[in-house]
Structures are given as C-alpha cells and as structure tokens.
Amino acid sequence: MKFFIDTANLDEIRSAAELGVLDGVTTNPSLIAKIVGDPSNFTYGDFKEHIRRICEIVDGPVSAEVTCLKAEEMIAQGEDLAAIHENVVVKCPLTIDGLKAIKHFSASGIRTNATLVFSPNQALLAAKAGADYVSPFVGRLDDISTDGMELVEQIVTIYDNYGYPTEVIVASVRHPQHVVTAAMMGADIATIPYSVIKQLANHPLTDAGLTKFMDDAAVMKK
C-alpha cells in the first residue's frame, strides 16, 4: 500500500518525507486555503508556485485540483497545472464535465485523479473515462451515517472484476483504523493527514515498554 499525505503544508510534507513512508501528496483548494493567511492576496501564480515547491520535496505524484466547473475550463487549467512538473496529477471532480476533462487528459497523457467520489457508480465512470486515480471520501460518508469503507470495498471489487488499472486513493481519512481497513481491503493508496500518520506509529504498550526499558537502563552501571 502507498501512503500519500493529504496537506498543502510544506513543513508537514517535509516531516512525513523524513519518515521514509511517503509516496505522494494530495492537495485541494480547502487545504491550500488553510495555509494562506489572506486568500485575497494569494494569486493563481502563487498557487502554481506552491505546487512546484511541493514537487521539489516529494518524488511522487502530487495532485493539484482544478478550480473551475466547465470541461473546457478544466482542460485549460489542467494543462497549465500539468506543465508545472512531471509529477503533477490533475484532480477533477466526478461530474459530467469532469468526466469530459478526464477523457481529454487521458488521451493527452496527462494523469488524473477523479475526486469527490461518493458512490460505486461514480468510481466506475471514472475508470471507464481513463482516470489514473479515484478518490472515495470515506470520512465525509461516515459523517452522514454511511459506511465509507464499504464504498472502498465495492470499488476495489469492481476494479478487480474488470481489471481496471485505476488506483484507489482512500481519502478523507480521519483515524488510523481507516488506513488499516483500507489496507485489508486491498486499496492501492491512502492519503492521510499528518496528524493521522503520527497516530499510526503510536501504541500505549510501546510507550509503556519504552518507559520500562529506559528505567532499567538508568540503573545499569556506566
């Protein structure tokens, strides 16, 4: 299983990369907004420069999302984003216009990530249109009392049934169990907030054992 980090924070990306477990990055407009003090002073050029800086840190796919709704506009912006760096993957929402853009990018050799996916039908359409990645948002489904991980299982089964090469990125991850369950289901990738990446390393018995070892080591003769 591959681990992506779901953030636009450069310090978090660097810290995750230092752990040796980072395979890529996903961003979206909301994550970009979190790191911008005053959005009115953050230009599209600033956005592209920020994506470029992320690509310099991580040697892997970096998803950058389009910020328009019409297919023609998505295509124009997506081509511009893809030109930033060879690792850029263009994120398109799973809409009718998004599918048109994904089809265009697939034919042009530009990698895509179909995002805001909440149903197996949407995931099937994404694969047929040629998306390289599909991002089911499990946490947001859990928020409305729906089993987000059941959707992941359905998508993995459908893709396995027909041999679709589209990789499943489990997104909107809220806690370590999302990651573990995704791995058990055979999802290709989990994109994880930095806080959850750190939680994956924690266990109370590890802490207790370390405390005991250090206490015992302290009484040993130097």
From Swiss-Prot:
This protein's UniProt keywords: Cytoplasm, Pentose shunt, Schiff base, Transferase
GO cellular component: cytoplasm
Principal EC category: transferase
Top-rank taxon, per record: Bacteria
Subcellular location: Cytoplasm
Pathway annotation from the record: Carbohydrate degradation; pentose phosphate pathway; D-glyceraldehyde 3-phosphate and beta-D-fructose 6-phosphate from D-ribose 5-phosphate and D-xylulose 5-phosphate (non-oxidative stage): step 2/3
Chemical reaction(s) catalysed: D-sedoheptulose 7-phosphate + D-glyceraldehyde 3-phosphate = D-erythrose 4-phosphate + beta-D-fructose 6-phosphate
Family: Belongs to the transaldolase family. Type 3B subfamily.
Role summary: Transaldolase is important for the balance of metabolites in the pentose-phosphate pathway.
Protein name: Probable transaldolase
Species whose genome carries this gene: Chlorobium limicola (strain DSM 245 / NBRC 103803 / 6330)
